[in-house]
Amino acid sequence: MRRVLVMQRIVVVGGGAAGIGAAGAAKAADSAADVRVYTEFEDVGYSPCGIPYVHGKEIPDFERLFLATKATYEATGIDIRYETEVTGVDAGKQTISVRGDGTTSYDKLIVCTGFDYAPVGVPGADLDGLYYVKNIRRAMEWDKVLDGVKAAVVVEASPLGLEMVTALCHRGIETHLIDPDAWALAAATDPDIAAPVQDSWRELGAHLHFNTTLTGFTGENSVRSVTTSDGEIRCDLAVVCTKKVANTALARAAGLKIGSANGVMVDEAMHTTTAGVWAAGDCIEVPHSVSQIPIQGLTGSHAYAQGKVAGTNAAGGQRKYQPVSVPWGMMAGEWMIGGV
């Protein structure tokens, strides 16, 4: 009797570092698999961490941030559906709902829906002129806008916020940073470590407003000032760099279990609590190697590694992801700051 080989369909939702890592690993583990990536955006597989450095003219162009070309993905046999939004998952029937295209079945599903920014929750948040650094096409558009910006306010001294302060100063823009803490990266650094970094920003011309809370954005159609607990700052642009939060809307709707850090719960194989469904990247939580406490919102490198684990296992291979220690480092002003 002739044995019939059935091609398995592995669907990846999300085209960031985790999604592309998952798709590539799945195809490597099972070259015959029908591997599909669905992304609501125009591009996949780039480094969002590099966006501030293009804005600051330290990296010459955005094209250098892409991991590969669209032709490269086609050549590897990965089917990427660009500008195609997945709106629902029926884990029982093993189908996804695609906006404007009905339902599609899957054998294995990998959820890599990434992150959103924590909402600022203040009046004026719907005005034009608020920039959320995330999507590379939007970053390209904003980069042209920066040529005409005279003054900008960066909201919160997150790692991304620190990079944007430096980038805007390098563009010759009057730059203000507001943050409710007493110094930059207060949750991760001591004040004596942050002090020389803050001094280097002041030397670049930045205005630092610590112990200062955002209270609103004002303007008729576009933002013209930022209001704070310490007064008003006139500006042409506000860069919102609030905390990253896991985008779990699709996962919750699919019935995946969400953990204490508000990320999708996974095991060391990146398998979720639902059969046939894996997850990776900024939408999940993983244990810290020392405390074993779940943590969420790591780096693109972590997301890519998690994606490779998820993709390998979804395709039938075996790979484990170990608890993370989270060493980190970043440029801040003229300094490199980091920890472990």
Give the positions of each predicted feature.
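Residue-level detector of alpha-helix initiation sites
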Residues: 16-20, 42, 115-117, 137, ...
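FAD-site-proximal beta/loop scaffold in flavoenzymes
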Residues: 126-149, 221-227, 232-309
